[in-house]
From Swiss-Prot:
Metal-binding among keywords: no
PANTHER family, per database record: OLIGORIBONUCLEASE, MITOCHONDRIAL
Gene name tied to this protein: orn
Role of this protein: 3'-to-5' exoribonuclease specific for small oligoribonucleotides.
Signal peptide: none
Protein family per UniProt: Belongs to the oligoribonuclease family.
Superkingdom of origin: Bacteria
Keywords noted in UniProt: Cytoplasm, Exonuclease, Hydrolase, Nuclease
InterPro entries tied to this protein: Exonuclease_RNaseT/DNA_pol3, Oligoribonuclease, RNaseH-like_sf, RNaseH_sf
MF term (GO), any: 3'-5'-RNA exonuclease activity
EC numbers, comma separated: 3.1.15.-
The protein, known as: Oligoribonuclease
HAMAP family per UniProt: Oligoribonuclease
Gene Ontology process terms (BP): DNA metabolic process
Length: 192
């Protein structure tokens, strides 16, 4: 989790050029009626070569929230073990928000780095409702890998089809997969 606790994790200096990657697993798609189940962050260097994993939280939700999920969410989050983790968790959204802010403040200044991920606007909608301080920590801009995915599908289908997602649907795995996907598109679509 921390680069000081684990000597195998490379040191990453605090910088406004670092990127913060985030993923949430939710009970559904509507932040007005659904809730956050899991959240993870990874901070990378600007060139994506260094990665520092932040805390990963399964967020406790009432049985009514979990029982009210649709079949896709029940199946996906049941297979991944997330439903059991959420039931067993004592972490609230406020607890997770506080810990994530403390972690991020070690690597990036407030208000200047974009939120990075896949379809990150959806995660941001949930953060506005349930973790507004965390959402406000980020710049209003996003680095959304799904934009490149949609462009690759139309402009360079071989770049699109050559990246295979594992579809694990756990927050930390999805964050790493988003970073890997951006690296893929940087090479095969953007030629940077």
């Amino acid at each position: 989790m921390s680069d000081t606790a684990n000597p195998t994790v490379p040191a990453l200096a605090k910088s406004d050029q670092n990127l913060v990657w985030l993923d949430c697993e939710m009970s559904g798609l509507n932040p007005e009626t659904e809730r956050l189940l899991e959240i993870a962050v990874v901070v990378t260097s600007a060139d994506l070569t260094l990665r520092v994993e932040g805390p990963v939280f399964a967020i406790h939700q009432a049985d009514a929230v979990l029982d009210g999920m649709d079949a896709w969410n029940k199946g996906t989050h049941g297979r991944s073990g997330l439903i059991d983790k959420v039931r067993a968790s004592t972490v609230t959204e406020a607890d997770a928000e506080r810990e994530l802010l403390a972690f991020l403040s070690r690597y990036v200044p407030k208000g200047v780095v974009p939120m990075c991920g896949n379809s990150i606007g959806q995660d941001r909608r949930f953060l506005v409702k349930y973790m507004p301080k965390l959402e406000a920590f980020f710049h209003y801009r996003n680095v959304d890998v799904s934009t490149l995915k949609e462009l690759a599908k139309r402009w360079k289908p071989e770049a699109y089809s050559s990246f295979k997602k594992a579809q694990r649907h756990t927050a930390l795995a999805d964050v790493h997969e988003s970073i890997d996907e951006l690296l893929h598109y940087r090479t095969h679509l953007l030629a940077v």
